[in-house]
Amino acid sequence: DRFGVKPLYYYPTAGGVLFASEPKAIFANPEANPVLDASGIAELFALTTAPTPGHGLYKGLRQVRPGQALRFDRNGVRELVYWALRAERHEEGAEDSAERAGQLLREAVAEQLVADVPLGSLLSGGLDSSAISAFAVAALDGDARRLPTFSVDFPGEGRGFVPTPWQSSWDEPYAQLAANFLGTPHRTVLVAPEEVLEQDEAVLQARDLPGWGELDASLYL
């Protein structure tokens, strides 16, 4: 896709190419070997959260880059660019810019609601998740009952919370305020520290590579 939101991996072989949305699906084929080379190790330790576009971490594994398509034939693989983000001079004023940004966000959220699985929205207590949930409720004709929301918290977090430069306030009260305002059926999922540790292996298997530690584990739970 244009922005690489939904990944597509590929692995050239002697007789063709394997492709899937997850590395584990490719490595289920005996023709693919999950081997880390020097380049993959560098990606793993230096660029885990912002990997090089197209790099699949494992040797021989590649990822289709945002805005690109691939063509396979007997001569190998060719990357075709079908879309690229262009930087242009911004002429609109603040009011028009805000209206346009709101329109684009509403359209983007509405498109994501087209799904063959139950809908849901994670409320973190921040601006992003609150705004997305509000746009989603509006796209569902204002029927907040159709958008269950949930937040993740830890036992005793409110009593023992200490502000940091990365997190100045406790998330849960703000998530609850957003849910009350929108009228969504809300659930707070309490995750004990031992549950986070117990899920490390499952989280790694789900991601196919190391990630954000306890953050990934809490989202998985």
Language model regions located:
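Cysteine-centered catalytic environments shared across enzyme families
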Residues: 1-206
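Short alpha-helical segments and helix-capping/turn motifs at coil-helix boundaries
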Residues: 55-56, 218-221
